[in-house]
From Swiss-Prot:
Protein name in the entry: Vicilin, 14 kDa component
GO-annotated cellular components: aleurone grain; vacuole
Residues forming coiled coils: none
Organism: Pisum sativum
Keywords, comma-separated and alphabetical: Glycoprotein, Seed storage protein, Storage protein, Vacuole
Region Disordered, annotated ranges: 23-57
Amino acid sequence: DRRQELSNENVLVKVSRRQLEELSKNAKSSSRRSVSSESGPFNLRSEDPLYSNNSGKFFELTPEKNQQLQDLDLFVNSVDLKEGSLLLPNYNSRALLVLVLVVNEGKGDFELVGQRNENQGKEN
């Protein structure tokens, strides 16, 4: 049954912090578009927030603004919310992978929200 095949394609898997650390030790960009690329951490909050109001601040770094993100074809967002504020999810339908880092009381957890096959959604 085709529906059964499709439902088995995008399985969410919980990954432990130790597994993430192990994977990130040797992580490199697979892109060959750029010969030189800065490496190392960057401070997302060193720029002005894209949006800011009484409820908090929304920071975004795009591939156009950061060479490392160009190599990975990646967008990075960060939100500082004040207590009692609410952020509704923003979903990019072209994203191949949506990964969320949830920080609660100083402890961070990665959550894989969705994954899409590159060919999914393309017209034949």
